């Protein structure tokens, strides 16, 4: 029908999608959230204000997981809120998908970069809040489909960091409700 009316295609804009998580032990602990939720709450809901309707726990030792632009935004936001921020990324800095300018600005603001490490578990305190992250030490293997060298775990080598907030910035996936709501 639409072709007869001169239309050439249809665009379905499903929004930013759903944030990805890593599905690791302890990831449902308190004070672990997606970068989408973190940045939305801080920037649009005044969540850094303890008197706000939905206040956010402001981390003193913040771990941001990921290597893209959103991870850099999350790092810099947490730093500006007073946190000691460490970015953890499973590949080397050269493989980070973030723009070089974003990485440069994050470093200038004092973000600690811990590359070739990947979270494998979060440990919670007696109240259910994250208190530590267990990181697998990685090394680079052969290039994958993206052309970047694949991260490979170094056997029996882990590091544990004390953290009180984790922001997961490992991408988004399409919302499955959109295709399910369209016929044909």
Report residues per predicted region:
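A Rossmann-like FAD-binding core segment of flavoenzymes
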Residues: 1-20, 46-52, 58, 80-184
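Glycine-rich dinucleotide-binding loop and its adjacent helix/turn
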Residues: 21-81, 183-184
